[in-house]
Amino acid sequence: HFAKKGIDSGGDGLICVNNRAGGHLGSHSMEDMYKELNDLGLPLICAGGIGSEIELYKALKIGFDGVQMGTRFVASTECNTLEDYKTAIVNASEEDIVSTTRLTGVPVSVIKSEGFRKDNTWLFKKLLESRFKHKARMILNLSSLFRSKYYLKKNNGKNSKKIQSLYSAGKSVHTIHKIESATSIMQHLGQSINISNIYN
């Protein structure tokens, strides 16, 4: 449905967000997404769960034209975010990545932390299942935004335990072992992948 909407809107390609992505995640595996979308005639970019050359190779071997990597580059020296966020990614395991609807009303992948709550209150659960779901999502989005701004201001721009659950990350965290420069990350990926082996 959404892929066809993208095509009808004149998109040059499709970002295929799978069920291992950070942030707003999809509901299908990368394999299933490719099978479902590969006959649409547009380049397909795999997004979700790509943190090292192993997952990159797998995505290209399946048939994707490229990949989109988010979590890996959050844990880079150039990324302008909290150092605690980067460290949380490096220290996290795949089992630490959980999905919550509390932030925006739709499933979001975050790093589980102290005080984390996965589900919304019963009231928002009901609203998200009703004809008011779009308004409920807007309220949750605004609430998350103002809450994070409040705690950052309260702590003079520093992180606090109150906003740790806002650390979005995908299941590729288990492949990330240190904070590196974007150049180093790209060089390693490029040197590790033998393109000729993928397409032969």
At which residue positions do the language-model features occur?
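Short beta->alpha connector loops at strand-helix junctions that form conserved
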Residues: 17-18, 48, 71
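Glycine/Thr-rich beta-alpha phosphate-binding loop at enzyme active sites
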Residues: 1-36, 76, 80-82
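Conserved active-site-proximal phosphate/metal-binding subdomains
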Residues: 29-43, 51-200
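Residues that cap or flank secondary-structure elements
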Residues: 25, 47-48
